[in-house]
Amino acid sequence: MTVVPGDHLLEPEAAGGGGGDPPQGGCVSGGGCDRYEPLPPALPAAGEQDCCGERVVINISGLRFETQLKTLCQFPETLLGDPKRRMRYFDPLRNEYFFDRNRPSFDAILYYYQSGGRIRRPVNVPIDIFSEEIRFYQLGEEAMEKFREDEGFLREEERPLPRRDFQRQVWLLFEYPESSGPARGIAIVSVLVILISIVIFCLETLPEFRDEKDYPASPSQDVFEAANNSTSGASSGASSFSDPFFVVETLCIIWFSFELLVRFFACPSKATFSRNIMNLIDIVAIIPYFITLGTELAERQGNGQQAMSLAILRVIRLVRVFRIFKLSRHSKGLQILGQTLKASMRELGLLIFFLFIGVILFSSAVYFAEADDPSSGFNSIPDAFWWAVVTMTTVGYGDMHPVTIGGKIVGSLCAIAGVLTIALPVPVIVSNFNYFYHRETEGEEQAQYMHVGSCQHLSSSAEELRKARSNSTLSKSEYMVIEEGGMNHSAFPQTPFKTGNSTATCTTNNNPNSCVNIKKIFTDV
């Protein structure tokens, strides 16, 4: 019995011999029955055409696998489960399907069909190669999500967009610099304003620019300031608004406030926007200016009387340094670092807990070891906390050090314990960093292939992708016609746009199924 993929017609049995029902046929040649020809067997139903119990041979780079068609038909939306998709790989001479793919990976791919949807990566196959195989065989997003969860990857959060067109355009303009040229220009302006604000914050602390009333000074300067506070208070308050640093700071705050308000009114969810840590940093970055401005106005109305404690005012001014974290909105590196720290909070908590135990243990030990030496600087266990922290982190400032033999032994053990304690959670943190880094890199590579927005924007994206891929050399198996449900091929007079190793088409009707998601069909050979 021979299996012919596509038609799957069984060879007719001989007309003569055998028992059972007589063969059905018809007479040919003239009015009489000169000879008898059996009729071909009836074609199976549409749903049963390929889902029979016949066996099929799959050749993966020379390694032959054999399975039943009904096993593959469990997942008709995949490459092997759809007879039309896998037909292009059929070799009629050898009566088998040939795929020039990774051989060790196909053990897990075939097990996916045999087990009813369980995906397991072979230990000798790298994660990135197995991910490419899942995409090539089109196992679907659900299989990819299961695989990533089994490998310990974090689930990517969806980024909703506003529903209104104008609101969505404004949100993309200020939140996603890579969305368009104007958005990239706004991001550059925002980065420049942040850098100018940080430079001004540092320069105004120089002695020639420093306002002695707001920043610490030497004791003699404090006495001189107190003596002349009554005479110079009003004039200094009057000149504060004409200070160049104040003018530049005001311009920066105007931009920060404008950017924050626009993003707040254009965001898809006000509650989510208010809980975002980056937005809270934006709010904290502009609050010190308004507090300082209110203090200056209160001093002018109070004839130079101090309206706020200098210590509180200096702390408020110090909060301005958090503006540097605003750069993380425009820096992929800082975002990766923040995501790594967030994902490694448990490991960091364990590290701090271990260091806390070590500090208590070794500070107590060194205190009692140095108790008999009057020249020792370890006057109490709390005083030894600083020495224990510096020693366990292998910094070693040298301001406090043991002098006795017992103290030196304790110090040696403290340093060794610190090295071991810090080294334990480092591999996990590095693994998280590598994951976020490779995910960001993979996202940037696939961003040029992904279909973003509606169908009406596809033509321009297709033209750009054709230009980008015009010089690439592709094998015959790289271009795959992806057929989605509900698509009418007669409605596609235009040339399909090709994304590396996949082919996608899009109509201009209002059917959401007429657009093919490039992320779902992206394959690699």
Swiss-Prot record:
Extracellular side: 204-244, 299-312, 368-408
Role summary: Mediates the voltage-dependent potassium ion permeability of excitable membranes. Assuming opened or closed conformations in response to the voltage difference across the membrane, the protein forms a potassium-selective channel through which potassium ions may pass in accordance with their electrochemical gradient.
Protein name in the entry: Potassium voltage-gated channel subfamily A member 3
GO biological process annotation, one example: potassium ion transmembrane transport
GO-annotated cellular components: axon; calyx of Held; glutamatergic synapse; membrane; membrane raft; plasma membrane; postsynaptic membrane; presynaptic membrane
Cell location: Cell membrane
Protein source organism: Rattus norvegicus
Modified residues (Phosphotyrosine): 449
Post-translational modification remark: Phosphorylation on Tyr-449 inhibits its channel activity. N-glycosylation promotes the cell surface expression.
Keywords, alphabetical: Cell membrane, Glycoprotein, Ion channel, Ion transport, Lipoprotein, Membrane, Palmitate, Phosphoprotein, Potassium, Potassium channel, Potassium transport, Transmembrane, Transmembrane helix, Transport, Voltage-gated channel
Catalysis: reaction(s): K(+)(in) = K(+)(out)
Bilayer topology term: Multi-pass membrane protein
Sequence motif: Selectivity filter, positions: 394-399
Residue interval(s) of motif PDZ-binding: 523-525
All ranges on the Cytoplasmic side of the membrane: 1-184, 267-277, 332-347, 432-525
UniProt-annotated site: Not glycosylated, residues: 228
Regulation: Activity is up-regulated by JAK2.
Region (Disordered): 1-23
Region (Interaction with KCNE4): 432-525
Family matches, as SUPFAM superfamilies: POZ domain, Voltage-gated potassium channels
Residue numbers of Phosphoserine PTMs: 470
Coarse class of the protein's main subcellular location: membrane
